Amino acid sequence: VNVWAFRSRLGIVSSDLQQNYAAYIRTIEVVVSGFFASVGIWNHHQLSDDQVERSRAVLSEIGIGDLADRPFGQLSTGQQRRVLLARALVTEPANLVLDEPTSGLDLTATFRYLDTLRHLMSSGRTIVLVTHHIHELPPEIERVVLLKEGEVFADGPKASILNAQNLSTLFDAPVGLIQSNGWYQAVPG
């Protein structure tokens, strides 16, 4: 397997990546760095006008085009996560891996982020969403893999895997489950 070819088809968003960017770097530079799979822009990187234009377009597509020239460190956590999503999307990867993308976000920012994910999924993009919170699973998620102690505990269609029994066993606690309009919510069981 050619790792570089595989990497070009994969966009990644994680809180670890968010912490690696200097506060002074401009938002547009964070997004452009996605073309180089780097943290920041370095002297050996040769930026094209097309790359900068594409980066601005992706920021606009996800509703934060007005933040392009602001320092990354001046953005809210939710805005920073959306910038990282734009960075992941700038090369138009076939697949996205989102590792706890809404951790630390307030309710409004979480809902906004999930709405963006729903839009991406409806356009046919494959998304692997890593989360500890069932309420973050958009209705468009079809397959769920539950992990316990590093092992696959359950794997299959969301409707058959997400149930109170599986979740209670998974978390070693009584868990109830509420479903509404394709969304799930875990509650004390």
How should each PLM-predicted stretch be described?
Residues 15-74:
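ABC-family P-loop ATPase nucleotide-binding domains
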Residues 96-100:
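Catalytic Walker B motif of ABC-type/P-loop ATPase nucleotide-binding domains
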Residues 144-157:
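H-loop (His-switch) and adjacent beta-strand-loop-beta switch element
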Residues 131-132:
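H-loop/switch region of ABC-family ATPase nucleotide-binding domains
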Residues 85-86:
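Hydrophobic anchor residue at the start of the ABC signature
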Residues 170-189:
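ABC ATPase nucleotide-binding domains
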Residues 92:
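Conserved catalytic motifs of ABC-family nucleotide-binding domains
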